Amino acid sequence: MIYSSMNLLSSAMATLLMIYLLSVKELQLGSYAVTITVFESIELVAFFLGSLFPFDFYRKLSIRSNLLFENSLALLMIISIFVWHNPIVLFTLLFLSSYATAISNPKSDTIVIFSIVEERQNAVFSIFSTIVTATVPLGAAVILALNQSLGATWSWTLLAFLAVFNIGYTCFWKEETRAVS
């Protein structure tokens, strides 16, 4: 559930940010096209660096700590959009978030694999991956509908509440350490 919620949050944030950047010139780096290019490049470089050169400190943290950090960064990104209107702050948070995600995603997959008995791993992991992957277009579609009906401010507010929910859920989430049969 937490992985689906995080995927929904990140895809909704990315979609809404692309729309929001059109109307908020303070967050743009020159033109809209340049800003989107920089946005995507920062994300790609951070994923690459996080995959190849992970910080040992972050890699050794529990998955709960990783999830708390990533959701906190998402909340900070939402706040930065409204409070600071500074593209450098936003892109720094994006880099940190993408870097952290690149480190923790393989760890999350490993936890799922090791918590399931070997005979059922393929089926359960396929279902898990399908559910988590399905939240990406769902997040984009839901936030587009909300943005059209409620506006950007309410949409960002709802995403902030989702980030807070994720943080609360993660605090009380019990990590599974035994194999499910």
Show which residues each predicted segment covers:
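Helix-loop junctions at membrane interfaces in 12-TM secondary transporters
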Residues: 81-94
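Structural signature of the two symmetry-related core transmembrane helices
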Residues: 65-79, 160-161
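Substrate-agnostic recognition of the 12-TM MFS/MFS-like secondary transporter fold
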Residues: 2-14, 46-47, 51, 93-144
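Helix-to-loop junctions at the C-terminal end of transmembrane segments
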Residues: 49-63, 147-148
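A single, central transmembrane helix in multi-pass transporters
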Residues: 1-48
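Transmembrane alpha-helix termini and helix-breaking/packing motifs in multi-pass membrane transporters
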Residues: 16-27, 56, 138-157
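Multi-pass alpha-helical transporter architecture, strongest
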Residues: 56, 81, 152, 158-181
